[in-house]
Amino acid sequence: MNQLVSICMPCYNAARYVGPALDSALAQTWPNVEIIVVNDGSTDGSGEILADYEGRGVKVIHQANRGQCAAANRAYGESSGDYIKFFDADDLLSPDFITQQMARLDGRTDAVASAEWGRFHDDNLATFKLNPQSVWRDMEATEWLVEAWSDARSMMQCALWLIPRQVLERSGGWDESLSLINDFEFFARVMCHSEEVLFTPGATLYYRSGITGSLSGQKSRKAVESAYHSICRGTGHLLARRDDPAAKRSCANVLQDFIYTYYPDHSDLLAKMETRIPGMGGSELVPGGPPKFHALRRFVGWKAARRIQRLFGH
């Protein structure tokens, strides 16, 4: 039976990208797909572009700007599918993406399907390169979180996942108080209400990088507070399910990475993170950075090296 899959897309000021994203959704080979786009108060002409797609079977809903999470929840609330894929308005899916993920799930309603991904830059797919990760395999769901967070470099982008409606009914929708890295908290919660992650080789997400003004690039106080709360809540979901040393260590590494990322700014949030890490057993995570940063930190320590890096902008 060809069960219905709902693609739920929030769209805010994505006029440059939403057409190709929807084209990739419309090109899916799975025969029973509905596409729901919520135009979240766009002011750049996205609404006019979306109007052209309504005649091609895309359901478009317009609302005043309420944020990405509210738009995703609205799209989900309007959906009817047995399986749900949340999809950003600036990325691309390979044509067999949903067909392959549905084959992996094979009717299961207690597991989620994951996928391959890679980045491309400057609207040029010739720059695309897969980014293999250790979690590209079938795994128990909470073990996926432990492994993905172990180096604090997890990729939890929404389009990677095909989620049974029954899982979402247990986990709940997107947290509308969050903006930056909202997917961290959401998918931690989804995983904690799933039994297994089934990896889907060949299902490829083309992740667009380098977009000026993108949500992931925001560094305002409000955005950083969102990242802080998303990390605290997301790690809390995992630790409520299991508190073994491996889980605690991975959570500590995620908190430590937040400190590395935002130091020396937002000192109050960094201090709060620092107080939580010892209770998780500590972190031995090394800060990320270019070769010059690592060479410098060996002599002056990571904090001084980060300040110098910020001062000179590289």
Segments and roles (model prediction):
Residues 249-261:
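Amphipathic alpha-helical repeat scaffolds of TPR domains
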Residues 202-211, 217-245, 265-282:
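Catalytic core of nucleotide-sugar-dependent glycosyltransferases
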Residues 122, 260-267:
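Active-site activation/catalytic loop segments of kinase-like enzymes and analogous catalytic loops
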Residues 267-314:
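Membrane-interface aromatic/basic loop that binds lipid-linked glycans or pyrophosphate carriers
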Residues 178-179, 199, 243-251:
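Short, surface-exposed helix-loop/turn micro-motifs enriched in polar/charged residues
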Residues 1-225:
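Nucleotide-sugar donor-binding/catalytic module of glycosyltransferases
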Residues 184-187, 231, 255-258:
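Hydrophobic alpha-helical core bundles mediating ligand binding, dimerization, or RNAP-core interactions
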